[in-house]
Amino acid sequence: MKRIWWKEAVGYQIYPKSFKDTNGDGIGDLKGILEKLPYLKELGIDFIWICPFYPSPMKDNGYDVADYYGIDPCFGTMEDMDLLLKKAGELGIRVIIDMVLNHTSDQHAWFREALKDPNSEYRDYYMFVQSKERPSNTRSCFGGSVWEKAGEDCWYYHTFDKSQPDLNWESQKLREELYNILNYWMEKGVSGFRFDAITYIKKVNSLVSHEPDNTDGLISVETTGQNQEGIREFLQEMNHKCLRDPEIMTVAEAPGVPYENLSEFIGEDGYFSMVFDFSYADIDLLPGSNWYNQAPWTFGDLKKLLFRSQCSVQTQGWGAIYLENHDQSRSFNKYFREKAAARDDLHLRFLQGSALATLLMGLRGTVFVYQGEELGSENGKFNSIEEYDDLNTKDQYRRALCAGYDEAQSLKFVNDRSRDNSRMPFPWTAEANGGFTSGMPWLKCNDDYAAICAKKQEQDKDSLLHYYRNLIRIRKDEANRESLIYGEVREIQNALESVIAFERIAENGEKIQIWINMSDETRQADIAEGEILCNNYSETSQKSLNPYQAVMVRCR
């Protein structure tokens, strides 16, 4: 297997608005990331993925881009970005940036010109249709129709919010504009891109109505606007024109790609270095996009999804491993549900957090840690829908009410799933607002910040933060690299349902076993003899696992 830096790297996703504010306006900024680079270096991070920082009206927190060549003033200046790239490079930390190429903001100059003049060259950059009636009954990802009125008998298409008009990838001129943007940022010094919602760029039969899949009379945009026939030509062209250098790391948010087609996306000649798999992250939802349709699941179900993903990816290319991101709730609350540690039970929180950390660092693929995950951050406590910022959360609340749930039930659904759970300000210290800002934070802080803050955990050698540091060191250790990074994943079949057990097997036959008890009861195990690499308890038995115990052993 080809060896390359991004396969061996551990990444850290930064949601800049919530990471560190340096000027007291309540919004995190690029200088805040720069200030905390030593913290990331100490953690063992090789690259950071920074969520959008471009000029934006912030209807969708930066995923509505108004200018791909600039920096939003709330985040700083281009000089700040240049300095961040320079200082990160000096510390051996590469920078990956979010690239949103399915849509722009409705405030982008292209769209404004297209609206102002139907004969503008930019009209073809978007999907405009002349029609007296709504062109089709397709539902957007954020609810309601994908079609929005743009003057008399004219409509434009939006996969997400109406403030995010979709780009028309059928236009060669538009595609060349997008490739110029990628080349600009690579010349700036970024080491790669995370491509947002990239499998939505091709639409088929977008003007045709279909049998509704819900009482709103609409059908999901996934039917005609996700991973459609013809997308491969677009992705291949982008790859050939911009991304042929194997040193450039590319990771795609690529929903809708079946496992049997993964080699086209991440194989030796694939379009991207890796893709995110949503199957196990969305285990708590039934098919569709309604958060009130919560799915019952067991740890047996989780294991099936995890190992199906791992086994499918390892035969076709390379994967991106994560448990949390800016679009997900916190993993504590998702995977442990009602068993998640009470806020004042810090020992239980350590056990559960270290169990999840061991799973994350034991799997095959490039590891992504989301900000605050290394501290054991949990979902927040939102007391009303007014406390939320996320537009999707507000739409999901409305959907639940329309489906007949009362306000308390609807709030419970969005409390469980809201993207704002992972977007709350990072807790640096026990000071006001967790040391995130000297002003009023743009989103409320989690009320447990003093108990789990980074400063407190840095001073405690037995903290979850130190456990993460140690795991990252173990993963990168030369003695473990061939097993833990490049080795095959093989499930240990005789493990009990609530025990996730697997081996990482190097080409030379060396093995590392990982055993994780996801339950609050002692469970039977059959751990191999060997060197204990990590253990979240002070003792180890080969035949049993304590509640939430996680053990990694290099087999003899």
Report residues per predicted region:
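Active-site and adjacent substrate-binding regions of carbohydrate-active enzymes
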Residues: M1-E529, C534-R556
